[in-house]
Amino acid sequence: RTTHFWISIFCLVSMLPILGFLKNYKNIQNEEANIMSSKDEPSIKLSNNQLQIILMFAGVCCCVAMSMPQVHMVALCVDNGFGLQVGTEILAVMLYSGMISRIVFGFLSDKIGPLPTILLGSFLQMVSLVFFLPFNSQLSLYMVSLMFGLSQGGIVPAYAIIIRKYLPLQQAGVRVGLVLGATIVGMALGGWISGEIFDLTQSYYLAFVNG
């Protein structure tokens, strides 16, 4: 609780000046830049609203899977007898590696495009979740959590890139907000439903299967 408080103070102090800087940043985008940004991208035979709905649905689903280890890792470690500190360390490994993957997947999106990137990230996230099923030792949880973090961190940013490339620029703010809102719903739903599954089965096995 104290940590969250001081993080909030840091965000308040640091983000307000940054927002002031961005507010005065001149927008130099033009029609030619918009054409150049998307000329190498494959066309999508969907309406704007259809693509929006698909992205929101994908955002919910990917974050249901993403939230399961993040929300319940500490409890899983405590249940396995590793203790609270080990659970916190494993969660930190997962989140730090997720920070790295956000940057790496950003470079990857520039190279192969956001659609292949999001498919690759989702596939790797699924594979890493599968590895949680047979392994429950302390070392294996460190390794699988590292793998999971490296796979999932770049998924959500790819949604914003897809919107930038395939949907009207004038609507980008609203559309990105809707997709990110859907991912937050997915994170909440995934954490809750995994807890419900654990309460019913007294095991996280089916919770990982659900993810």
Predicted feature residues:
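Paired small-residue
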Residues: 128, 139-147
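Intracellular juxtamembrane helix-capping segments at the cytosolic ends
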Residues: 154-167
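Interfacial helix-cap and linker-helix signal at transmembrane-aqueous boundaries
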Residues: 1, 77-78, 108-109, 193-202
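C-terminal membrane-cytosol helix-exit motif in multi-pass small-molecule transporters
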Residues: 8-35
